[in-house]
Amino acid sequence: MAAAVAAALARLLAAFLLLAAQVACEYGMVHVVSQAGGPEGKDYCILYNPQWAHLPHDLSKASFLQLRNWTASLLCSAADLPARGFSNQIPLVARGNCTFYEKVRLAQGSGARGLLIVSRERLVPPGGNKTQYDEIGIPVALLSYKDMLDIFTRFGRTVRAALYAPKEPVLDYNMVIIFIMAVGTVAIGGYWAGSRDVKKRYMKHKRDDGPEKQEDEAVDVTPVMTCVFVVMCCSMLVLLYYFYDLLVYVVIGIFCLASATGLYSCLAPCVRRLPFGKCRIPNNSLPYFHKRPQARMLLLALFCVAVSVVWGVFRNEDQWAWVLQDALGIAFCLYMLKTIRLPTFKACTLLLLVLFLYDIFFVFITPFLTKSGSSIMVEVATGPSDSATREKLPMVLKVPRLNSSPLALCDRPFSLLGFGDILVPGLLVAYCHRFDIQVQSSRVYFVACTIAYGVGLLVTFVALALMQRGQPALLYLVPCTLVTSCAVALWRRELGVFWTGSGFAKVLPPSPWAPAPADGPQPPKDSATPLSPQPPSEEPATSPWPAEQSPKSRTSEEMGAGAPMREPGSPAESEGRDQAQPSPVTQPGASA
């Protein structure tokens, strides 16, 4: 058995190492100067594959060679070669009609020291196979058609060029911003979700003074829902991989609607505290408006929709649209964290482990299943290289690189963190906070799980720096958060109740959010007859309270010792209720 497990682990490690060796492409620079003197040299972005040949990291170590414009030819056969070949030159040829290998093989055979393939379309990695890589010894890269025109317009037809690939900083300062946003969202969302859940349990029967004050009910996630959700995620990811240009607009539309809803949900509690705008719109028969919402809430809804629409229209403005996307994304994550509830640690473990395997499969295993050898997850998250729309999925936090680098010219200015890397561990953090409140543990679970999330995110950044490629963050976040939560439960000897959520049945002290005395639902009473404690057998048949939970079955001590019974809503009765222990109907046990 041990040998079989070791063999399986060895195979997984081998697969991981093979994947790590498959470098699809890297960005580099071509520095161009005029051979006859003139304007100062300029850098242009190229996309190259280091498996053909490596480029020097410093321009001072690169060789300046003549750049020959041969774009009138596709360089797919020997007939396309010039009579004297490309001796000690870097030819520029057009893309198309044959493979990259055929072009670079002909160029190398004619004496070229490098090859630049001009593309009118989006730049794609110049790929090949291992045998072809071993045969070729010169660098091959793709240059955009627009840059090729600028080169010969600016420097004339006789130019010299050097190819190099400057090193980027191991970590960019934008990682600090992403870390603060991610950990802050998880901490605030988890704290809000836990506090809101307990508040709603205490205020279960409260009557709001207006329809706009009604909050969305939390949704408990069941194992069946978890399985359905994962199947839907897999299906959607595969569909996006094959039909990206069509479905990307569907995802953008869904994000606009969901983020506007999330922003409204986050700002509504603040707006309700304002002392003005409480007037309601006139009576009408329009959908939703017939409930006569307050003017301030209506203005808030219009503001949230406007912010979402502005982002949707200007989403490709790299200078500032990322700020709106991050704000809307954080609001969306907070809304989801307080709306979706995992009722037990068992449900948390199931969801996190299934999505952990999902992340590993679509990042590390799918390259062996696709024809291009690319990861489905990475392709979808960053946008397929052959996408005609060049749209990006908005379900990420994105921050532009802050370190100065020549590679800023290339189309890779942002660092990304997916919403799933916030929401999935955040649901566990929210559960920990709810459990903390229920068992009165000074929020040790919440604090420990939040710190574990931060540590897992730091480990993700370290792995990103070491491997220099995108990482599945759940690979590091799930073990950190699950192991930490489990360790705290073991240390406190509460693993059983933490696993099943049975700690929610404990009796809680009076909540600061307890409803106003006269607002709670009351059992029907005869206003003409003074009420007195009665045994459960004398409970009227029409009472909406269960026999074992009837207020009339309480002892005189529970109702306030010696307090005379009054009509519903009377001050004396309300005072007695306030002194009593919470009724089992309002205790957070049944739905935990």
Curated annotation (Swiss-Prot):
Monomer. Homodimer. Interacts with ITM2B. Interacts with TNF. Interacts with the simian foamy virus envelope glycoprotein gp130 and its processed leader peptide gp18LP; preferentially interacts with the leader peptide gp18LP. It is found in: Cell membrane; Golgi apparatus membrane; Lysosome membrane; Endosome membrane. A motif (PAL) lies at residues 472-474. Expressed predominantly in adrenal cortex and mammary gland. Residues 512-524 have a biased composition (Pro residues). It comes from the Eukaryota. Changing D421A: Loss of intramembrane-cleaving activity toward ITM2B, TNF and the simian foamy virus envelope glycoprotein gp130. One of its GO terms (biological process) is membrane protein proteolysis. Intramembrane-cleaving aspartic protease (I-CLiP) that cleaves type II membrane signal peptides in the hydrophobic plane of the membrane. Functions in ITM2B and TNF processing. Catalyzes the intramembrane cleavage of the anchored fragment of shed TNF-alpha (TNF), which promotes the release of the intracellular domain (ICD) for signaling to the nucleus. May play a role in the regulation of innate and adaptive immunity. Keywords: Cell membrane, Endosome, Glycoprotein, Golgi apparatus, Hydrolase, Lysosome, Membrane, Protease, Signal, Transmembrane, Transmembrane helix. Residues 71-149 form the PA domain. Residues 196-221, 272-293, 341-348, 434-445, 492-592 are cytoplasmic. This is Signal peptide peptidase-like 2B. The active site is at D359, D421. SMART domains: PSN. Residues 580-592 have a biased composition (Polar residues). Its main location: membrane.
